[in-house]
C-alpha cells in the first residue's frame, strides 16, 4: 500500500499486521521412519513435477480450461490499486461483527507525513466514525473500515455483502420462532446473565488448547505422556432447565461474593 486518500487529502502510509498467530505448526512426517514428507506440483496426466514458473491459473468450464496468466490479473486490477481510497464515513456500531475479518495497523511512511496522519486519526476519533475504504492487496480487492484505535489508525478488513450467508436461509427450520420458555425461566436466565456480567479484559483469556498441545509435545519429548482433558458437559434436558438455571445463578453469585472477600 502506498497511500491513504480521503477527499483531496492523501498521506503515504505503510500497512502492518496487527495480530500475531500463535498456532503451533506441525510438519508432515512418515509414521515409523520420521522422514519428512513434502508435497510437489505434479502434472496430473504425466506424473511429472512442474516448475513453479510454468504454473498458471485455470478456470474450469465444460469445454476444458480458461487459462489466465498472473500478469493478466495484474493488468485488470482496479485503478489506484495501491491506494486505500476512503469513500465515506460511518458509525462503526452499524457494522455487524460477522463482517469483520483481519486487522492491520497503518503508519505514516515518513516523519514528513505525521501531521496529515495525525489529523486523520484525531478527526476520526473526534467524529467517532470509521472510514469505509477499498484497496487491492495480493491481486485481490478488499473492503475495509479505517478507525482511530489506541493512538494509531487501524484497518479492519471486511467481508463483502455477498460473502455473508443469510442465517435464515442457511439454518432454515432449525431456527425456532420463539424459545418456548416460561416467563420464570426467562427471568432466571436474565438473572444468570447479570450475575455473570464482567468487565472485558482480553488479557484474562488464553488459548488453553495451544498450551495443552505444547504440554503434550514437551511430555512426549521427555518420554512421557499427558492425561486426557476434561470431557465436555452433558446436554441440559428441558425438564432440568429451571433447576440448572437456579443452580447456575447461585454458583455465579457465590463466585462474585468470594471475589469480593479476597479483595
From Swiss-Prot:
Transmembrane ranges, per UniProt, are none
- Keyword entries, A-Z: DNA damage, DNA recombination, DNA repair, DNA-binding
Does the record bear Calcium in its keywords? no
**GO-annotated biological processes:** DNA recombination; double-strand break repair via nonhomologous end joining
GO terms for molecular function, please?
double-stranded DNA binding
**Per the record's keyword annotation, is Cytoplasm included, yes or no?**
no
Q: Which Pfam families is this protein grouped with?
A: Ku (PF02735)
Q: Which Gene3D superfamilies match?
A: 2.40.290.10
Domain Ku stretches: 6-169
Q: Which protein family is it in?
A: Belongs to the prokaryotic Ku family.
* Subunit (UniProt): Homodimer. Interacts with LigD.
**Biological role:** With LigD forms a non-homologous end joining (NHEJ) DNA repair enzyme, which repairs dsDNA breaks with reduced fidelity. Binds linear dsDNA with 5'- and 3'- overhangs but not closed circular dsDNA nor ssDNA. Recruits and stimulates the ligase activity of LigD.
Task: From the Swiss-Prot or TrEMBL record, give the protein name.
Answer: Non-homologous end joining protein Ku 3
The species this protein was found in: Saccharopolyspora erythraea (strain ATCC 11635 / DSM 40517 / JCM 4748 / NBRC 13426 / NCIMB 8594 / NRRL 2338)
Q: Which gene encodes it?
A: ku3
